[in-house]
Amino acid sequence: LEAPVISHLQHTNVSAISKELSQQLAANGSLSSGRVLTLVVLAEKGHSREALNAAIRASHEHPSRIIVHIAHSETDPDQLDAEIHVGGEAGASELIILRGWGSASKPTEALISGLLLPDAPIVVWWPYTAPVNPAEDPLGRIAQRRITDSQKDPLVDALYNRRNSYTDGDSDLAWARITPWRGVVASALDQPPFEPVIEAKVYGATNCPSVDLAAGWLAARLGVPVTRIAVDDPSVKKQASLNVTPVERVELIRPSGATVLEALDSQTIG
């Protein structure tokens, strides 16, 4: 891995950050023309490291410009600090980490727009707290894709709000987390016995929107009653192997009996 070029700027502004980035790219022999998108990560102090690592991993497959804004205290004096990474862990991407206090703690369009790649799609990701209506957020309005996470959003009934405010271009990681599971269930329905499913039961943690979505998806696709069962209910006997995926167990009930799919480990559903 090549040694990264990292610049630290304190008490700075967008113009100075953009100038420093241009100088780094020129010195490193890099061109932004190969970047496929700008990923804007709107994080909060204490909830940024996981999102930052995920963005860096994704950038190795999809070279991009990553802008991470970490909100600090709104009540502190105004201050904007920045780190600019070119090469190293940023791979073929450019990584800009902004830390804002006071008025700079709010990731406004004026703050972010001067750092965006020209003529490239914009993806905005709220890894923790998201607006009630992401498409109406100032940054959400300029983005082609808006990513939220109902599982981590402290907003009460975040999934309900995502549904009510859905706009084309919205994505929620609660749905993405059950993509492998949906594939397994679809495959199971193509196997004997070739009988109609008359009822289904979905098991998972109480406060898990992925499990809610899984139950709703089955009900919509199969047109049958689906019972959503909380495995953290003391009345539910838990298997030692469970609690590793959002949907821990599903029972597809047919006239001849039930087909049971269980999460065996973090990678296997059987």
Language-model features: locations:
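An N-terminal, globular interaction/scaffold subdomain
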Residues: 1-125
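C-terminal structured domains
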Residues: 24-28, 215-220, 227-270
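Short, surface-exposed beta-strand/loop "edge" segments at domain boundaries and coil↔beta transitions
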Residues: 47-50, 208-209, 255-263
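A short acidic (Asp/Glu
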Residues: 51-52, 108-109, 134-136, 210-214
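Structural alpha-beta junctions
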Residues: 58-68, 116-123, 141-147, 219-232
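Acidic, Ser/Thr-rich peripheral helices and adjacent loops at domain boundaries
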Residues: 81-88, 140-153, 240-260
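Internal, hydrophobic cores of structured domains that mediate oligomerization or house catalytic pockets
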Residues: 94, 98-186, 198
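ATP/pyrophosphate-binding catalytic subdomain of soluble kinases
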Residues: 174-231, 249
